[in-house]
UniProtKB/Swiss-Prot annotation:
GO CC terms in record: ATP-binding cassette (ABC) transporter complex; outer membrane-bounded periplasmic space
Gene name per UniProt: lsrB
Keyword Signal: yes
Family from the record: Belongs to the bacterial solute-binding protein 2 family.
Subcellular location: Periplasm
Species in which this protein is naturally found: Klebsiella pneumoniae subsp. pneumoniae (strain ATCC 700721 / MGH 78578)
Entry protein name: Autoinducer 2-binding protein LsrB
Pfam families registered for this protein in UniProt: Peripla_BP_4
Functional summary from the UniProt entry: Part of the ABC transporter complex LsrABCD involved in autoinducer 2 (AI-2) import. Binds AI-2 and delivers it to the LsrC and LsrD permeases.
Stretch forming the signal peptide: 1-19
UniProt subunit comment: The complex is composed of two ATP-binding proteins (LsrA), two transmembrane proteins (LsrC and LsrD) and a solute-binding protein (LsrB).
Keyword line: Periplasm, Signal
Keyword Transmembrane: no
């Protein structure tokens, strides 16, 4: 009898340990290289930490699709959810319910309102990323009165709109003669993005630059320029090196930026694992991530938020990268 009780206790402890270490990593949508790379980093970190990481997302970027996944993961007993939010507030009711049930909620890539999560794994502040967009463009645009188009995913997505707001403010301050002729959206759809990019180039034959801080919009703008045989347009923005490599090699794109999204996925899972094992992280605390280093929890104010609370903050990626013909082959994601 005593032996049976010992075996039963050991079995229950193993089951409990397995159930306590399940992390859901949710992109805006599946089938996009940027998000797949982030998911790969998340799963690599899970394997190294001995936790079970599930990567899944909607087939189209929608609040309802993400909410359904969040609810499913909560009902299945997952202990942490890390989501790239398609809306700053649309996911909040589902995420708040998850937190009430003891689930650790984090965001990565695109944030919710800060009160709807604990930690945001942030690729850069709006000032850093908006500034980088303008810096890449100004190095290629020689006209004092340049005509510029902005082209990205949607008018509601959190991260890209913050970057574009800062980029436009920088242009107004530092390049007051530049004219922003249009701001258009591809809605995370490759076909629509290509059609929209071609439409922009046709509508503005004297366009000097397209600024496209979106993983679908940037390659679409480059492909549109090639399809229409348009030269002399500076095409800059954010996407992954594997997607952009052919356009860089052909000279259609001279430079574009991003951050190491594989590292972002790894950092997110490491932070979630730290929350599960040791509890809240507060502003000023640090997290050690193997092969990356020590990362400090920053206040939400670095993202321009007014909300601060215990166990709530932002972990910034240590660096951003500008890719060009000289360095693009050093990266594979």
């Amino acid at each position: 009898m005593k032996l049976k009780l010992i075996v039963l206790a050991l079995t229950m402890s193993v089951v409990t340990a397995q159930a306590a270490d399940r992390i859901a990593f949710i992109p805006k949508l599946v089938g996009v290289g940027f998000f797949t790379s982030g998911g790969n980093g998340a799963k690599e970190a899970g394997k190294a930490l001995g936790v079970d990481v599930t990567y899944d997302g909607p087939t189209e970027p929608s609040v309802s699709g993400q909410v359904q996944l969040i609810n499913n993961f909560v009902n299945q007993g997952y202990n942490a959810i890390i989501v790239s939010a398609v809306s700053p507030d649309g996911l909040c009711p589902a995420l708040k319910r998850a937190m009430q049930r003891g689930v650790k909620v984090l965001t990565w890539d695109s944030d919710t309102k800060p009160e709807c999560r604990s930690i945001y794994i942030n690729q850069g502040t709006p000032q850093q990323l908006g500034g980088l967009l303008v810096e890449m463009a100004e190095k290629q645009v020689s006209k004092p009165a340049a005509k510029v188009a902005f082209f990205y995913s949607s008018p509601t997505v959190t991260d890209q709109n913050q970057w574009v707001k800062e980029a436009k403010a920088k242009i107004e301050k530092e390049h007051p003669q530049w004219q922003i002729v249009t701001t258009q959206f591809g809605y995370n759809d490759a076909t629509k993005s290509l059609q929209t990019a071609e439409g922009i180039l046709k509508a503005y034959p004297d366009l000097d630059a397209i600024i496209a801080p979106d993983a679908n919009a940037l390659p679409a703008a480059a492909q549109a320029a090639e399809n229409l045989k348009r030269q002399g347009v500076a095409i800059v923005g954010f996407s992954t090196p594997n997607v952009m490599r052919p356009y860089v090699e052909r000279g259609t794109v001279k430079a574009f930026g991003l951050w190491d999204v594989v590292k972002q996925g790894k950092i997110a899972v490491n932070v979630a694992d730290r929350l599960l094992k040791k509890g809240d992280l507060n502003v000023g605390d640090s997290v050690e991530v193997k092969d990356i280093g020590s990362l400090k929890v920053e206040p939400n104010s670095v993202q321009g938020y007014q909300y601060e609370a215990k166990g709530n903050g932002i972990v910034l990626l240590p660096e951003r990268v500008v890719f060009s013909k000289e360095n693009i082959n050093n990266y594979d994601f």
